[in-house]
Design a protein with these regions (language model features):
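Pepsin/retropepsin-fold aspartyl endopeptidases
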Residues: 1-164
């Protein structure tokens, strides 16, 4: 009788351990998760670092922006196709775009095709962010990116993730 109870308890504990292990594997298995915990701890800004080759580009996750933006200076550094269009932009002051840079950036080995509006007035805004926080921001990632790649921002866990 006691042996049967011990076996049942051991079996229940083993099943619980396996379930927890599987949950951890599933959580870690989301290779499309983007953490902005480090930047929030450092500067209280949701910033994610993308790469293009060996170059690093820090992008502020901006849920208030429909589109993703870079400055003219950053457009010179990023490899991509510039599509010449002009459009009025509202938000961080008034400005116009001098085109769209269609490029590919990577995060943790995953490539993302992204259209970045080249926005005239962002240089001063990025300089101000750097002066106040010490973080060099190269661009803004807007809602179009989150929708295209099906990202959800979780500000409790400080991650952007895709639902599988």
């Amino acid at each position: 009788m006691i042996l049967e109870i011990v076996i049942i308890i051991a079996a229940v504990l083993a099943v619980g351990y396996i379930v927890n292990l599987c949950e951890d594997i599933v959580k870690r298995g989301n290779d499309r998760e983007m953490s902005f915990r480090e930047s929030m701890d450092l500067a209280d800004l949701p910033v994610v670092t993308f790469y293009q080759g060996d170059k690093k580009f820090n992008f502020l996750l901006d849920t208030g922006s429909n589109y993703s933006h870079i400055s003219k200076e950053v457009a010179k550094e990023i490899q991509g196709e510039i599509i010449e269009t002009k459009a009025k932009v509202s938000g961080l002051g008034e400005g116009t775009t001098s085109g769209v840079c269609r490029t590919t950036l990577s995060y943790k080995g995953v490539n993302y095709d992204i259209d970045l509006s080249v926005t005239d007035h962002l240089t001063d805004a990025f300089a101000s962010i750097k002066a106040e926080t010490g973080v060099q921001v190269h661009g803004l990632i807007g809602n179009q990116f989150f929708q295209k790649h099906k990202y959800v921002l979780d500000f409790e866990k400080l991650v952007a993730y895709t639902k599988k």
